[in-house]
Regions:
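Alpha-helical transmembrane segments and their immediate juxtamembrane cytosolic regions
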Residues: 2-358
Length: 358
C-alpha cells in the first residue's frame, strides 16, 4: 500500500470538553468565548506539529512520486532493498488523530455542536479526496475521511481511557494483519488519546520524555528487525510480516522523537524554517504535488516512473519550489489557500481574512 497521508490542522490545546477529561482542564483554563463566536483561533500553533507535518510531507513525495507519475502502476524500487523504509503512514496518521482532537476541543469553545463542525470537516475532506483520486488512485484523503467518520468521530463520545485502550488493541491487531485501514484507525485513536491526555501540549516543553522514549523505541526497532531477519528465510517477500510492520512503526516513532529532541536544541530555528512552511500548508502542498508530478511526467516528458534517480531529483525540485512558495505565501497570509477553503467548509461560513496583520 502506498505510504502517503495527510494530517489534520493541529493548533491550540486539548482536553477540556471531551468525556473524562476533567483532569486536563487545569492545564488550560476555559476561554469563556460565546458559542456563537467567529471561528477565528487566537491559540498559538504548536510548532513541533508543523515541523513534523512538513518533514513527513517530504517523505510522502519521495515515497510515492513514481507511483503518482505512472498512475499507481509503477514497480517502485526500494532504495534499501526489500525493507520498506517509508514512514509516512504512522507519523501522519498519528498527527491526524492529534489534530482532530485539538480542533474538536477548539470548536467546543465556539459553537454549541462541535461534532457537527468536525463532521463537515471530514465530509469536505472526503469530497476533496474523491476529486484527487481521479489523478492519483493511491491517494489517502478518502481513506482518512472514511476512517475518521467511522472511527474517530464516534470515539469522541468515549472517555479518553477507552480511546487509549482501543488504540492499544487495534494497532497490534492491524500490524499482525499487514496494516491497512485498521492500522489507520488505531493510529488515529492513539493520536487522539495523546491529545486528550495533554501530551501534545507538552511536546514543546520537554527533552527528557522524547529522548527516553526514543531510546526505548530504538531498542524495540532493533529487536524487531533482528527477529524479522531470523524469520525472513522462506517467507513471502511480497507479504509484510508482523515483525517488519512493527519495525516500520517503531522506526517512525524514533524519527518523531529525534525531531522533537532536535527542536529543543540550537537546530530548532533551522528545522522550523525548513519544514514548518510546508507543514502549515500541507493540504495545498499535498494536492499540488500531484499536479506537478503529472506535469513533469506528461508535459516535460521526464522518466520519473522509470528512473529512481530522476524521480528523487524531481521530488527534490518540487519540494524546493513548494517550500519557497509556502514561505512567501505565509508572509502575507496565515494559512494556505486550500486550508482556507477547507476551513470555510468546516465552519459553514466564510472565514475572516487570513491576511497577516488583519
Amino acid at each position: 500500500m502506498p505510504r502517503e497521508e495527510f494530517p489534520g490542522e493541529p493548533t491550540g490545546h486539548p482536553g477540556r470538553h471531551l468525556p473524562d477529561d476533567a483532569t486536563a482542564s487545569t492545564a488550560t483554563p476555559a476561554s469563556g468565548r460565546s458559542p456563537t463566536a467567529a471561528p477565528a483561533s487566537g491559540r498559538p500553533r504548536i510548532i513541533a506539529l508543523d515541523v513534523l507535518r512538513g518533514f513527513t510531507l517530504c517523505e510522502i513525495l519521495f515515497a510515492n512520486i513514481q507511483l503518482i507519475a505512472d498512475h499507481g502502476t509503477a514497480v517502485v524500487t526500494q532504495p534499501m532493498g526489500d525493507w520498506d523504509p517509508w514512514l509516512g503512514l504512522p507519523i501522519f496518521s498519528l498527527l491526524f488523530g492529534i489534530g482532530f482532537t485539538l480542533l474538536l476541543d477548539s470548536a467546543a469553545d465556539r459553537v454549541s455542536r462541535p461534532r457537527l463542525v468536525l463532521l463537515r470537516r471530514l465530509v469536505a475532506l472526503l469530497a476533496i479526496g474523491l476529486v484527487h483520486v481521479v489523478l492519483w488512485p493511491g491517494e489517502i484523503l478518502t481513506r482518512y475521511a472514511v476512517v475518521g467518520l467511522l472511527v474517530l468521530l464516534p470515539s469522541s463520545w468515549l472517555p479518553r481511557w477507552a480511546v487509549a485502550g482501543l488504540a492499544a488493541v487495534l494497532v497490534p491487531v492491524a500490524l499482525w494483519g499487514g496494516g491497512g485501514p485498521l492500522l489507520i484507525a488505531g493510529l488515529f485513536l492513539l493520536g487522539s488519546a495523546l491529545a486528550r491526555y495533554g501530551v501534545a501540549d507538552q511536546i514543546e516543553r520537554s527533552i527528557r520524555g522524547p529522548l527516553l522514549l526514543g531510546l526505548v523505541l530504538t531498542a524495540g526497532a532493533a529487536t524487531a528487525l533482528w527477529a524479522h531477519g531470523q524469520m525472513e528465510a522462506g517467507a513471502d517477500p511480497m507479504q509484510p510480516s508482523f515483525t517488519s510492520s512493527l519495525a516500520d512503526l517503531l522506526i517512525a516513532g524514533v524519527v518523531v522523537c529525534a525531531l522533537l529532541v532536535l527542536l529543543r536544541t540550537p537546530l530548532r530555528p533551522v528545522l522550523r524554517v525548513v519544514f514548518a512552511p510546508l507543514g502549515r500548508m500541507a493540504l495545498t502542498n499535498y494536492l499540488t504535488a500531484t499536479l506537478l508530478v503529472l506535469a513533469a511526467t506528461h508535459v516535460l516528458g521526464l522518466p520519473i516512473g522509470q528512473s529512481l534517480q530522476v524521480a528523487f531529483l524531481a521530488a527534490g525540485a518540487i519540494l524546493a519550489a513548494q517550500w519557497l512558495l509556502s514561505a512567501l505565501w505565509l508572509r502575507r497570509y496565515r494559512q494556505g489557500p486550500l486550508e482556507w477553503l477547507w476551513r470555510w467548509a468546516t465552519w459553514a461560513r466564510r472565514p475572516p481574512s487570513s491576511r497577516v496583520g488583519t
